[in-house]
């Protein structure tokens, strides 16, 4: 009977589009999963007249969902067991120490430091320990309305356990889903990168500067997605006996990395090329090809999520062929970088087209792993310069002061001050300031909207439905817009307390006050305790970026001299570290915009450095992207490439003046003009761009040090 019903539903015209919409949005899928678990736990209890039990289970499930990690099912089982133990310890400690406020405050502060440092050991532990801190605060909030002291240590971890079992059941039905979601996020992030980059073809100088800044910011998202893919792949590889089941996903990951290197490549300043009518015509075609490639990547991402096999777009193949044909008709200078650009796009197209070709297979690549033991990772955080230790101490002191204010002033539900501190306080000043406004705005909107709707829906059933709708919308918006998600978590809490004690509406004004106090404490703690002003970090970040760029360029030259046989792990690590260092510089520049005025004096200079370093990395990426097809012709170029590497390494140490760079640029120009063959001339053009960008970065870095001293 049930099978026939399912078959009838599948035959409906709306079923397939609905299925695709459902599976192609990971945030929506997560929201439905969490809301279903909360509904299963809360609805029977609330409707049967036991709202405290239902709401406590729901809060436990909420904490469990927020602390869930992307693991192989076996890893998820270990994570769930650890989570339930930590949640029980946290809630049990709160109930035992609740009659002794001084001990509870001290215990809260010390346990917060411990949990955050354990979370720094790895991604799996980070989620569990965050959830343990969160559920402990939930236990503090619910202590006054609990029928007995033993209920919360049972119900809150129990809710997390039941949610975890429900999530595990769904994961066993689709065991590869976390990996597919992370890969899909990576392809979508890269598709957006290509869409932005297409605006450079063609462009003027102002557009070039504006778009390069946006590309640097989008690159942060792409590299973060690649890192998450690597972590999840590592989790799956640790849980499997062999690599064979993982091979399709490893191939997708390697393709994503290769496409990213090609997309990040720059062959010349495109505003200069856009001035030539013939080149402009080809650049317009390159821009259209990039847009077609971004569409293909979105198709790839949707296929990973929905299970629909990837079909290479015919329009992309046609566009690439037309562009190649137009280039053949165009008379270009021997040193024009446009053939490299067109070849780069063609190889990206070929890589995507061969994705499903079973004949195109390589060995299973190794993945970068942290060689340190768990204890060594923990111990490495125990120094005063470690950002995570500083954040843990800030947060624990923030908790301690917030809890003291709550106790000394006998505030109703003053524990919300502590809860606000947890969500607002971030490791950086700029991150905290951003969260502060988002939290306050979201809470105010949630209170106004929530109180209005609770008055319209006075019944238990109506408020239960409103609570579940709030849970769904909270998870659906959590990764998209934090302010919007805060609105719905506020209405969720309002409904929850209204169901338990009919106090949700009366507690909303105190909740606003607690939010303001908690946000203020978070702001003061990050402002006064080890404020990590970005302008002061810029010289160190620039030094690290140049160091990693030099290592990446050195790895490229090693590939030209002696290609890797099968697995190029060392090359991939060098490339990834260069992008991470570039991202750190980009985020520092972005963070400066939220810092106090006197700390923003070097913001324009910081933007120029960020822009130039990202351009330098793009030129290096271009030299690396062509290492396979141009290796044979690189013999006469390698000596100059070695000198360019020496310039990069000297710039890293700060010991190179402008003259040596100028001499190298002059020599590259002379060699390029004296070379007849097109490939070496194109390579020399790339080397010239690398050396020129290095010299510009070095010149600006001297001005940056001067600005820093004045500040």
What are these regions (language model features)?
Residues 452-593, 597-601, 610:
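Generic detector of multi-pass transmembrane helix bundles and their immediately adjacent loops
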Residues 5, 17-30, 47-49, 70-81, ...:
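Short, amphipathic, aromatic/basic-enriched membrane-interface segments that mark the entry/exit
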Residues 1-35, 39, 43, 47, ...:
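Long, hydrophobic alpha-helical segments that serve as membrane-spanning/inserting helices
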Residues 15-32, 36-150:
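Helix-loop-helix transmembrane hairpins and adjacent membrane-interface loops
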Residues 48-49, 371-472, 491:
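Core alpha-helical transmembrane segments of integral membrane proteins
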Residues 28-36, 77-85, 105-110, 149-157, ...:
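Hydrophobic alpha-helical transmembrane segments
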Residues 127, 131-152, 494-511, 529:
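Transmembrane helix-loop junctions at the membrane interface of multipass transporters and ion channels
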């Amino acid at each position: 009977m049930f099978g026939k019903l399912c078959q009838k539903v599948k035959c409906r015209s709306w079923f397939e589009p609905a299925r695709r919409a459902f599976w192609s949005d990971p945030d929506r899928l997560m929201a439905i999963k969490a809301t279903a678990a909360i509904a299963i736990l809360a609805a029977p209890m609330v409707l049967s007249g036991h709202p405290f039990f239902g709401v406590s289970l729901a809060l436990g499930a909420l904490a469990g969902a927020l602390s869930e990690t992307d693991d192989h099912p076996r890893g998820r089982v270990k994570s769930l067991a650890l989570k339930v133990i930590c949640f029980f310890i946290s809630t049990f400690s709160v109930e035992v120490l609740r009659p002794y406020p001084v001990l509870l405050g001290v215990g809260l502060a010390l346990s917060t430091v411990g949990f955050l440092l354990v979370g720094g050991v790895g991604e799996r532990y980070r989620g569990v320990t965050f959830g343990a801190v969160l559920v402990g605060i939930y236990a503090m909030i619910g202590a006054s309305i609990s029928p007995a002291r033993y209920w919360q240590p049972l119900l809150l971890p129990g809710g997390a356990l039941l949610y975890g079992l429900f999530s595990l059941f769904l994961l066993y039905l689709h065991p590869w889903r976390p990996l597919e979601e992370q890969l899909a996020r990576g392809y979508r992030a890269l598709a957006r990168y290509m869409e932005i980059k297409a605006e450079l073809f063609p462009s003027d100088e102002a557009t070039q500067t504006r778009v390069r800044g946006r590309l640097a910011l989008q690159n942060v998202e792409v590299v973060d997605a690649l890192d998450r893919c690597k972590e999840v792949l590592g989790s799956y590889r640790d849980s499997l006996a062999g690599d064979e089941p993982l091979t399709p996903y490893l191939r997708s990951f390697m393709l994503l990395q290769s496409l990213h290197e090609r997309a990040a490549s720059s062959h010349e300043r495109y505003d200069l090329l856009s001035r030539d009518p013939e080149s402009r015509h080809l650049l317009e075609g390159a821009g259209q090809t990039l847009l077609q490639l971004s569409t293909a990547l979105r198709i790839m991402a949707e296929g990973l999520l929905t299970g629909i096999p990837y079909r290479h777009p015919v329009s992309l193949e046609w566009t690439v062929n037309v562009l190649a044909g137009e280039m053949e008709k165009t008379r270009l200078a021997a040193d024009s970088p446009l053939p490299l650009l067109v070849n780069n796009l063609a190889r990206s197209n070929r890589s995507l087209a061969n994705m499903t070709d079973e004949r195109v297979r390589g060995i299973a690549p190794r993945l970068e792993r942290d060689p340190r033991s768990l204890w060594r990772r923990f111990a490495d955080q125990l120094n005063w310069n470690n950002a995570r230790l500083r954040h843990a101490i800030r947060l624990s002191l923030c908790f301690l002061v917030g809890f003291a204010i709550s106790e000394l002033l006998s505030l109703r539900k003053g524990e919300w001050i502590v809860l606000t501190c947890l969500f607002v306080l971030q490791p950086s000043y700029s991150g905290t300031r951003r969260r502060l406004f988002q939290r306050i705005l979201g809470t105010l909107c949630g209170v106004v909207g929530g109180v209005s709707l609770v008055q319209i829906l006075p019944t238990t059933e109506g408020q239960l439905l409103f609570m579940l709708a709030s849970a769904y919308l909270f998870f659906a918006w959590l990764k998209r817009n934090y302010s919007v998600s805060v609105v719905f978590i506020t209405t969720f809490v309002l409904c929850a307390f209204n169901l338990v004690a009919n106090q949700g509406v009366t507690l909303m004004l105190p909740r606003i006050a607690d939010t303001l106090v908690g946000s203020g404490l978070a702001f003061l703690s990050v402002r006064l305790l080890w404020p990590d002003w970005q302008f002061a970090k810029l010289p160190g970040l620039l030094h690290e970026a140049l160091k990693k760029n030099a290592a990446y360029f050195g790895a490229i030259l090693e590939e030209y001299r002696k290609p890797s046989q099968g697995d190029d792990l060392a090359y991939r690590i060098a490339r990834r570290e260069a992008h991470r260092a570039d991202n750190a510089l980009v985020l520092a520049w972005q963070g400066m915009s939220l810092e106090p005025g006197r700390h923003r004096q070097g913001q324009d200079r910081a933007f120029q450095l960020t822009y130039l370093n990202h351009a330098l990395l793009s030129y290096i990426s271009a030299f690396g992207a062509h290492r396979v097809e141009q290796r044979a012709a690189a013999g006469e170029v390698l000596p100059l490439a070695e000198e360019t590497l020496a310039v990069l390494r000297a710039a890293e140490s700060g010991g190179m003046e402008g003259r040596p760079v100028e001499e190298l640029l002059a020599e590259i120009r002379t060699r390029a003009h004296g070379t007849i063959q097109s490939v070496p001339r194109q390579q020399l053009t790339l080397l010239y761009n690398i050396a020129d960008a290095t010299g510009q970065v070095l010149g600006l870095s001297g001005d940056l040090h001067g600005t820093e001293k004045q500040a």
